[in-house]
């Protein structure tokens, strides 16, 4: 289905409810620049570096698009998807069945779930929705629960320390969304809905957060304007 949620005035803050879940794949593909390409890069990289039968956990898996891509590249992997939206997981489970992919789904709060012994943890545009006061503790939990030499992949929307540059990047991004078919009104309504819900960090803040959480290295492996994908190693 096509994302037309913000064609009407918003009545509440943004949340991943049934209405969002039904259009999520269209929404994210049109809202995140090079989403398909960056997701494919993540899956290609993981398919090369993960050991046989590795345990891979996607926290905030939404409709499982990335996990399905990973399954197609490495059918031996043990895949787990966690999300707190039943509507998202209903779609994810249906897609997994259609593709014949064995993926273990769990509907729970990613801050509370158990993923000990994972060889890879993925947070694809998820960390930015966690309250800043809880992010450091959560990232420490990820590092502690990863296996030795485990990999942490996280994708995030960014802000820039240079406020003028940040403003320019936001305007470039909004031009991108217009080119994807969103009206100025829809863009403005979604921006209002996400205020105080999506709270981005700078690239350096994200890297520092990972290093302070115990990861031995962290690199940006993909970046476009105010979007980036990071890989950290335990």
Question: What residue ranges belong to the model's regions?
Answer:
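N-terminal, positively charged/glycine-rich alpha-helical extensions of SAM-dependent methyltransferases
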Residues: 1-23
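A conserved beta-strand element that flanks and buttresses the S-adenosyl-L-methionine
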Residues: 122
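A short glycine-rich, Lys/Arg-flanked "PGG" loop and its adjoining helix->strand segment in the class I
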Residues: 136-148
């Amino acid at each position: 289905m096509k994302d037309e949620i913000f064609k009407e005035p918003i009545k509440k803050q943004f949340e991943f409810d049934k209405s969002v879940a039904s259009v999520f794949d269209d929404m994210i593909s049109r809202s995140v620049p090079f989403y398909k390409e960056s997701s494919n890069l993540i899956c290609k990289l993981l398919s090369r570096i993960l050991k046989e039968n590795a345990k891979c956990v996607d926290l905030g898996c939404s409709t499982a698009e990335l996990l399905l891509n990973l399954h197609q590249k490495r059918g031996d992997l043990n895949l787990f998807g966690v999300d707190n939206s039943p509507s998202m997981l209903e779609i994810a489970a249906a897609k997994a069945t259609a593709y014949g992919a064995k993926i273990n789904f769990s509907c729970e709060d990613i801050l509370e779930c158990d993923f000990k012994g994972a060889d890879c943890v993925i947070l694809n545009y998820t960390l930015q929705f966690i309250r800043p006061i809880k992010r450091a503790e959560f990232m420490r939990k990820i590092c502690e629960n990863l296996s030795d030499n485990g990999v942490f992949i996280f994708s995030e929307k960014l802000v820039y320390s240079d406020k003028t540059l940040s403003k320019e990047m936001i305007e470039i991004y909004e031009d991108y969304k217009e080119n994807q078919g969103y009206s100025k009104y829809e863009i403005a309504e979604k921006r209002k809905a996400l205020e105080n819900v999506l709270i981005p960090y700078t690239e350096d803040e994200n890297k520092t957060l990972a290093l302070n959480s115990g990861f031995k290295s962290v690199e940006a492996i993909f970046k476009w304007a105010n979007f980036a994908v990071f890989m950290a190693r335990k």
